[in-house]
Amino acid sequence: MGKCQVISHPLIQHKLSILRRQTTSTKDFRELVNEIAMLMGYEVSRDLPLEDVDIQTPVSKTVQKQLAGKKLAIVPILRAGIGMVDGLLSLVPAAKVGHIGMYRNEETLEPVEYLVKLPEDINQRQIFLVDPMLATGGSAILAVDSLKKRGAANIKFVCLVAAPEGVKKLQEAHPDIDIFTAALDDHLNEHGYIVPGLGDAGDRLFGTK
């Protein structure tokens, strides 16, 4: 079974508290999502493999470390996942970026996929699948399904806020997936929103209703 890790770094928790506030502006919300994603990236990438490399400093030759193994791909679930991409790219600027488009049917609460655009070598890459919210788990499960259909095998799901119901569903559907979140909240309400949550991340990121 994949793990669910809550990243409780003080800076992340401080910024998340501001992010949750109803009075936080669109501009500040967007910046905070970017900053939290970047800070989470350090923990999410902790187990990336390293290899020895010979280099010449201004003083002498030395053997140091550099990233090795599979290349990275960052795949946001549209539209809200877009807000997390730049923060992660600031750490791994050579990563490719794919897109999986989803919207939620407000009557059934089920996700509907409308776009899949991925690097051609997605099956050779370690993937950070990103979405600010893990609520019902439906979108995350469908996105992982899409990635696995295209040969992807090394996938981490990264979100800012998760509900226990969504974590349980994702782990049951894909027990090989590790989940990284900044907060594990209380529950989902009758509308499928995380409580206390932070509202609709997409609307708050882009200033829409």
From Swiss-Prot:
The record lists uracil as bound by I194, G199, D200, A201
* Taxonomy, superkingdom: Bacteria
Question: So what does this one do?
Answer: Catalyzes the conversion of uracil and 5-phospho-alpha-D-ribose 1-diphosphate (PRPP) to UMP and diphosphate.
Q: Which cofactor is essential here?
A: Mg(2+)
Q: What is this protein called?
A: Uracil phosphoribosyltransferase
Look at the named UniProt entry and state the broad enzyme category this protein falls under.
Answer: transferase
Q: Which HAMAP family match?
A: Upp_B
Q: Tell me, what controls this protein's activity? A: Allosterically activated by GTP.
Any idea which GO molecular function terms this record carries? GTP binding; magnesium ion binding; uracil phosphoribosyltransferase activity
Q: What catalytic activity does the UniProt entry give for this protein? A: UMP + diphosphate = 5-phospho-alpha-D-ribose 1-diphosphate + uracil
Known PANTHER family for this protein? Answer: ADENINE PHOSPHORIBOSYLTRANSFERASE (PTHR32315), URACIL PHOSPHORIBOSYLTRANSFERASE, CHLOROPLASTIC (PTHR32315:SF4)
Q: Which family does it belong to?
A: Belongs to the UPRTase family.
InterPro entries from the entry? PRibTrfase_dom, PRTase-like, Upp_B, UPRTase/APRTase, Ura_phspho_trans
Identify the residues that bind 5-phospho-alpha-D-ribose 1-diphosphate. R79, R104, D131, P132, M133, L134, A135, T136, G137, G138, S139, D200
Q: What is its EC number?
A: 2.4.2.9
Which Pfam families does the UniProt entry name for this protein?
UPRTase
Statement: the UniProt record of this protein carries the keyword NAD: no
Species name:
Streptococcus pyogenes serotype M1
Pathway per its UniProt entry is: Pyrimidine metabolism; UMP biosynthesis via salvage pathway; UMP from uracil: step 1/1
Q: Which GO terms describe its biological process?
A: UMP salvage; uracil salvage
